Amino acid sequence: MEEEMQPAEEGPSVPKIYKQRSPYSVLKTFPSKRPALAKRYERPTLVELPHVRAPPPPPPPFAPHAAVSISSSEPPPQQFQAQSSYPPGPGRAAAAASSSSPSCTPATSQGHLRTPAQPPPASPAASSSSSFAAVVRYGPGAAAAAGTGGTGSDSASLELSAESRMILDAFAQQCSRVLSLLNCGGKLLDSNHSQSMISCVKQEGSSYNERQEHCHIGKGVHSQTSDNVDIEMQYMQRKQQTSAFLRVFTDSLQNYLLSGSFPTPNPSSASEYGHLADVDPLSTSPVHTLGGWTSPATSESHGHPSSSTLPEEEEEEDEEGYCPRCQELEQEVISLQQENEELRRKLESIPVPCQTVLDYLKMVLQHHNQLLIPQPADQPTEGSKQLLNNYPVYITSKQWDEAVNSSKKDGRRLLRYLIRFVFTTDELKYSCGLGKRKRSVQSGETGPERRPLDPVKVTCLREFIRMHCTSNPDWWMPSEEQINKVFSDAVGHARQGRAVGTFLHNGGSFYEGIDHQASQDEVFNKSSQDGSGD
C-alpha cells in the first residue's frame, strides 16, 4: 500500500499510474455476491470544477464547470495538477481516463450542472464507470477513451456506452412526459423553482468539501483497515449520491421544461462534439447553465430536433410563431396607438379660445334660443300606444281598438283611421298632401303657402301599415300607389269641410268595395283641380 501511495503523491505521471492500476484490476472482492450492486452503484464522481486553462476565464455566478471524476486513492488537491498537465482536447480525456488517479473528463462547452460526485470503487467495473461518465457528458470520444482505459475490451465498453445512452434517452422522454402531465402548463410548479435549483447547487458544493474530507479519510482507512470497511463506506456514499443524483436529475428536467424546448444532440454525430473541451464556458447563456440536464446546443433555434427531444414538435411549433390574424391585430393596435399619439399632439397644438370669444358664443346661443318658437311635441298621454319604436307617433288604446275593429282587415281602411287620429283637420286642410306635385299656376289661387305633411308621421304610417299587414297575413296589404291615394283623399275631404273619415260612416257605400272606382276617380280629379292633389 505504501508503494501505491508514493507514486500518487509524486505526480500524475502516466506510466506509474498505469502500473499502480494493475493490482486493482486483479483484485476482485466478492465477485459472486455483489456483481449487481457494483453495476447498480457503479457511477463516476462528477464534481463541478472550473476550467484550468491559460489564462483561466472568470466563471459566472452559476459557472459552467468541468466534470471531474475523483478516485479515493489520492487527495483532491492534486487533481488540478493532473488536469493542467495535459493539453486541452480529447487527448486529455483519453490520458486521464486511462489512469487510476483522478480521471479527469474534459468539460463541455455548455457547462450544465452535472450529477453529484461519487467516488468510483476499486473494483473491476472501472470501464463501465468511465464509459458512463462519457455518456453523461455526451462525448463519444471520451466514451471510447474511457473504454480503452479499463480492463474490459473495447467492444464491451462501446456496447455499454450505447446501452447507457439508450437508457438515458428513454428515461428522459418518459420523465418529460410524466412531468408535462403533472405540471399542467406549469400551474402546479412552485414559483421558487430557481431558488430550489440554487440551493441544490449550494448543497452540491458543500457535499464536495465533505467528499474531499472523505477522500483524505478514505486514504488512511484504506491503508489501515480491511476492504470490507472501505466497501461499506463506499456503499453508504453511493446510496446518498444516488438519491442526490435522482433529485438533481428531476429538478433539471423540470427546469428544462420550464426554460423552453431545446434540441437534444444526436448521439450518432460524433463530429459535432469533438471540440467541446476547447469552447469558452462563458459563451453559454444563463438559461442553459441553470438548466441542469439539458442539451449541449447553445443555439436558441428550434430547427431539426433529434429523436430524443423532450417536448413534442407540435408544442415547439405552437410556441414558435403567431397566427396571421394575431399579427394583423398586433399591427392594427400599433397603428391605432400611433394615430392616438398624432391626435393628441394636434389637440395640444390647438390654441384655447379666450374668454371674450366664449362669452360672445354664449350670447349668440341665448339670442337664438329666444327667437325659436317652441313647437308642441306630441307627448304621450296616459294609456297611449306608440306605433313604431323609432318614431314619436302615439295613439290611444281606444283609438287603436276602433281602427282595428272598423277596418275589416283591410290595410287601406286602417290607414284612413290612423291618418284621422295622427293628423288634425287643419294640418290636412292647409297642406299640399305629400308634396309630390306642384300647384297649378293657371288656377291663380291665392292664399297661404301650403306645405307637405309631416314626413316623419307619413313615413311612420307607411311602415306601420306594411309591418302590420306582413305580421298578420289575413290582412290585405295595399300597394304604394294605393297608400298615396289614401293620403290625397284625406287632404281633399279635409278641404271640403268634412271631418277626415266621416265619409266612412255617413256614406256607407262610398268606400265599401273596390268596385266604386268611379267615385274615387271623381274625388281625385276634383282635388287635383283645386291644386291639392297628390
Swiss-Prot record:
The keyword Zinc does not apply. GO terms for molecular function: DNA binding. Residues 91-109 have a biased composition (Low complexity). Keywords: Coiled coil. Residues 69-83, 295-310 have a biased composition (Polar residues). It comes from the Eukaryota. Transmembrane segments: none annotated. Residues 1-24, 48-128, 287-322 are annotated as: Disordered. InterPro entries: BEN_domain, BEND4. Residues 311-321 have a biased composition (Acidic residues). PROSITE patterns: BEN. Residues 53-63 have a biased composition (Pro residues). SMART domains: BEN. Residues 324-351 form a coiled coil. Residues 390-498 form the BEN domain. This is BEN domain-containing protein 4. It comes from Homo sapiens (Human). The gene is BEND4.
